[in-house]
Amino acid sequence: MNWLDTVRWDDKGLVPVIAQEAASGDVLMFAWMNREALQKTAELGQAVYFSRSRGRLWHKGEESGHLQTVHEIRLDCDSDVVLLKVTQLGHEPGIACHTGRHSCFFSLYKDGQWVATEPVLKDPASIYK
């Protein structure tokens, strides 16, 4: 059996993916992969996702330069979620979020509202031209 056949793909042929920074353990982002994206990620050693809005593969950092070097690819106990342990490249600290922040999980629920807890490290307008 091919290693990709072990993954429990959803009815659209996708699997959810969490990118975690290998050094710090920070959760950077959530995305989706199809079979081709997961295979390319394993081959290249860089994160390649499937963009549902664009309907195509998305090599993380292709526009921004904020690539993700993949150190480990893990599959959860139900074989339906992938975890990538990555090094976020392109800025120090790494910028994983399109808002110019380190992590996409910068909003904290506190006292009945969402509060931004991470600074914008780089203006998105200067990242995506």
From Swiss-Prot:
Keyword vocabulary terms for this entry: Amino-acid biosynthesis, Cytoplasm, Histidine biosynthesis, Hydrolase, Magnesium, Metal-binding, Zinc
Pfam families documented for this protein: PRA-CH
One biological process term in Gene Ontology: L-histidine biosynthetic process
Biological or metabolic pathway of the protein: Amino-acid biosynthesis; L-histidine biosynthesis; L-histidine from 5-phospho-alpha-D-ribose 1-diphosphate: step 3/9
Positions contributing to Mg(2+) binding: D76, D78, D80
Cofactor binding notes: Binds 1 Mg(2+) ion per subunit.
Cofactor: Mg(2+); Zn(2+)
GO CC annotations on file: cytoplasm
InterPro entries the UniProt entry points to: PRA-CH (IPR026660), PRib_AMP_CycHydrolase_dom (IPR002496), PRib_AMP_CycHydrolase_sf (IPR038019)
Keyword match Mitochondrion: no
Molecular function terms from GO: magnesium ion binding; phosphoribosyl-AMP cyclohydrolase activity; zinc ion binding
Subcellular location per the Swiss-Prot or TrEMBL entry: Cytoplasm
PANTHER family reported for this sequence: HISTIDINE BIOSYNTHESIS BIFUNCTIONAL PROTEIN, HISTIDINE BIOSYNTHESIS BIFUNCTIONAL PROTEIN HIS7
Self-association state and partner proteins as the record states: Homodimer.
Role summary: Catalyzes the hydrolysis of the adenine ring of phosphoribosyl-AMP.
Protein name as catalogued: Phosphoribosyl-AMP cyclohydrolase
Provenance organism: Polaromonas naphthalenivorans (strain CJ2)
Lineage: Bacteria, Pseudomonadati, Pseudomonadota, Betaproteobacteria, Burkholderiales
